[in-house]
Amino acid sequence: MAAAKGIAIGIDLGTTYSCVGVFQHGKVEIIANDQGNRTTPSYVAFTDTERLIGDAAKNQVAMNPQNTVFDAKRLIGRKFNDPVVQSDMKLWPFQVINEGGKPKVLVSYKGENKAFYPEEISSMVLTKMKETAEAFLGHPVTNAVITVPAYFNDSQRQATKDAGVIAGLNVLRIINEPTAAAIAYGLDKGGRGERHVLIFDLGGGTFDVSILTIDDGIFEVKATAGDTHLGGEDFDNRLVSHFVEEFKRKHKKDISQNKRAVRRLRTACERAKRTLSSSTQANLEIDSLYEGIDFYTSITRARFEELCADLFRGTLEPVEKALRDAKMDKAKIHDIVLVGGSTRIPKVQRLLQDYFNGRDLNKSINPDEAVAYGAAVQAAILMGDKSEKVQDLLLLDVAPLSLGLETAGGVMTALIKRNSTIPTKQTQIFTTYSDNQPGVLIQVYEGERAMTKDNNLLGRFDLTGIPPAPRGVPQIEVTFDIDANGILNVTAMDKSTGKANKITITNDKGRLSKEEIERMVLDAEKYKAEDEVQREKIAAKNALESYAFNMKSVVSDEGLKGKISESDKKKILDKCNELLSWLEANQLAEKDEFDHKRKELEQMCNPIITKLYQGGCTGPACGTGYAPGRPATGPTIEEVD
């Protein structure tokens, strides 16, 4: 057995599932847990007698929803009044309380109420992963690399590190999930010439797009974009809402307020979603779901795709943003890599493939395991593994925001530009603004706006003792130096005297949240017009798609048989199908094209629908109140004579 001190593990701490790997004997082993599963649910449950972690916790969730905690990753490193926390709280069956501005999860454990910080919940999941690795290796393990989404801010990274410490781990480094996946991918491919790789990571709870350049074993992150709140859970939510409505229609009962019923339904929905990645239909059978009523139903892949259409299409926006940030055309991307269980959804793959003009997607890495695989390799590198496979690998990350200082008139002068590779060091010469100025105030900011008042102040310090001289004569050398962990050192030195002063800006100085980073980037004037155009385009696209789907369901309704001629019905269905196919191939068309296509469809449908209503109403469809643009499943409206 190898000496314990020489072994380090890689942990993918996911929102919904976690995974652990170890690099030994020249290859990565992804380690199965005690249930034989290679991924473990990021769930912790508390009962009257015990604490359960992983599969055991998830398996009993329907019976004990209030005391089963998941999604700790959505809380970690956030304040209680963070809008993300406030909106998520509405969806969780467990209770979140405010303690000194920080969120804590309140549960009943062994008969008494206990409150846990998110770091504590995450540390329990990490402990489970640590024990899984120890059972496989046969000795204790303390060293680990843990991954986080690329957009996690410093407090979220620090809190994740704290969770590792609570779990008894020595956290060697926190690395980005897409970066970890890139390492896995780089090892699989071997470095032959420069390649641009787009990593599309759609997991259970977060979505990240990263563009990397891999050249001869050197990885460079060119750009990252994403959404901290998009993933498999959101697709589950759409299915849950769909079936809650169906139950209401069939049985005239609302189950949405019954936490246990919703939880059981959610479990069945997750299973159905997975089935739909390989089959075109999935059946749900839930005995005694609510008030003794059995719920047996089914859903097709097409209906699932329709329910999540906007979410699926929305995954292309961060792809476009990352390409813009990397100043790269989509034709320049050599490989598209799928990471995260949700990338198994055929529609997601199809949209991405269409966007890249039918290019093949790289699915050679198991999407659930790629991140842990890369983390395990990085752990081996940090432990000094001399294996030929890893020794030439070098990893470069990027700064998510520009860093600079305030110059005369409150202007932001950036020394390190957004998306610069880190570690990095930049030096610039500044001078005094007035005659005989005895000192300068160095104020360090991060952000994309032209004026410092619109950016985020990270810290400030004075450099004094400058010899009297006319303005513009003294030479003050300012150096910005970021290390591999994102810690910034700013030094100012008067070149005539050699006198210097410095400040270190570390992770715990309350850096920006992802939302603020996004706000500052999007607020920047140059993006305003572009954002507006994009919003209008998406609204027009959605309007066209929903109108086409509505028309299809109106004319296909059984209750309208005999009210509409087969030729009219065929005409509408053919036109709708033609437009939906066009949409498939042109998701990124212009607003005017979408509007034009919708008007075209309306001009064809309106006379037929009007004729339908003027024909009177005697059949079973009487009173269903169909109208152009109204969903076929809309509310019943009584007809007035």
Curated annotation (Swiss-Prot):
<keyword id="KW-0346">Stress response</keyword>
<dbReference type="GO" id="GO:0005524">
    <property type="term" value="F:ATP binding"/>
</dbReference>
<dbReference type="GO" id="GO:0031072">
    <property type="term" value="F:heat shock protein binding"/>
</dbReference>
<keyword id="KW-0143">Chaperone</keyword>
<feature type="binding site">
    <location>
        <position position="73"/>
    </location>
    <ligand>
        <name>ATP</name>
    </ligand>
</feature>
<dbReference type="GO" id="GO:0007339">
    <property type="term" value="P:binding of sperm to zona pellucida"/>
</dbReference>
<feature type="binding site">
    <location>
        <begin position="204"/>
        <end position="206"/>
    </location>
    <ligand>
        <name>ATP</name>
    </ligand>
</feature>
<dbReference type="InterPro" id="IPR043129">
    <property type="entry name" value="ATPase_NBD"/>
</dbReference>
<feature type="binding site">
    <location>
        <begin position="270"/>
        <end position="277"/>
    </location>
    <ligand>
        <name>ATP</name>
    </ligand>
</feature>
<dbReference type="GO" id="GO:0002199">
    <property type="term" value="C:zona pellucida receptor complex"/>
</dbReference>
<dbReference type="InterPro" id="IPR029048">
    <property type="entry name" value="HSP70_C_sf"/>
</dbReference>
<dbReference type="GO" id="GO:0051082">
    <property type="term" value="F:unfolded protein binding"/>
</dbReference>
<feature type="binding site">
    <location>
        <begin position="14"/>
        <end position="17"/>
    </location>
    <ligand>
        <name>ATP</name>
    </ligand>
</feature>
<dbReference type="InterPro" id="IPR029047">
    <property type="entry name" value="HSP70_peptide-bd_sf"/>
</dbReference>
<dbReference type="InterPro" id="IPR013126">
    <property type="entry name" value="Hsp_70_fam"/>
</dbReference>
<comment type="similarity">
    <text>Belongs to the heat shock protein 70 family.</text>
</comment>
<dbReference type="Pfam" id="PF00012">
    <property type="entry name" value="HSP70"/>
</dbReference>
<feature type="region of interest" description="Substrate-binding domain (SBD)">
    <location>
        <begin position="396"/>
        <end position="511"/>
    </location>
</feature>
<dbReference type="GO" id="GO:0031625">
    <property type="term" value="F:ubiquitin protein ligase binding"/>
</dbReference>
<dbReference type="GO" id="GO:0140662">
    <property type="term" value="F:ATP-dependent protein folding chaperone"/>
</dbReference>
<comment type="function">
    <text>Molecular chaperone implicated in a wide variety of cellular processes, including protection of the proteome from stress, folding and transport of newly synthesized polypeptides, activation of proteolysis of misfolded proteins and the formation and dissociation of protein complexes. Plays a pivotal role in the protein quality control system, ensuring the correct folding of proteins, the re-folding of misfolded proteins and controlling the targeting of proteins for subsequent degradation. This is achieved through cycles of ATP binding, ATP hydrolysis and ADP release, mediated by co-chaperones.</text>
</comment>
<dbReference type="GO" id="GO:0005829">
    <property type="term" value="C:cytosol"/>
</dbReference>
<feature type="region of interest" description="Nucleotide-binding domain (NBD)">
    <location>
        <begin position="3"/>
        <end position="388"/>
    </location>
</feature>
<dbReference type="GO" id="GO:0044297">
    <property type="term" value="C:cell body"/>
</dbReference>
<dbReference type="GO" id="GO:0008180">
    <property type="term" value="C:COP9 signalosome"/>
</dbReference>
<protein>
    <recommendedName>
        <fullName>Heat shock 70 kDa protein 1-like</fullName>
    </recommendedName>
</protein>
<dbReference type="InterPro" id="IPR018181">
    <property type="entry name" value="Heat_shock_70_CS"/>
</dbReference>
<dbReference type="GO" id="GO:0042026">
    <property type="term" value="P:protein refolding"/>
</dbReference>
<keyword id="KW-0547">Nucleotide-binding</keyword>
<dbReference type="GO" id="GO:1903955">
    <property type="term" value="P:positive regulation of protein targeting to mitochondrion"/>
</dbReference>
<comment type="subunit">
    <text>Interacts with PRKN.</text>
</comment>
<feature type="binding site">
    <location>
        <begin position="341"/>
        <end position="344"/>
    </location>
    <ligand>
        <name>ATP</name>
    </ligand>
</feature>
<keyword id="KW-0067">ATP-binding</keyword>
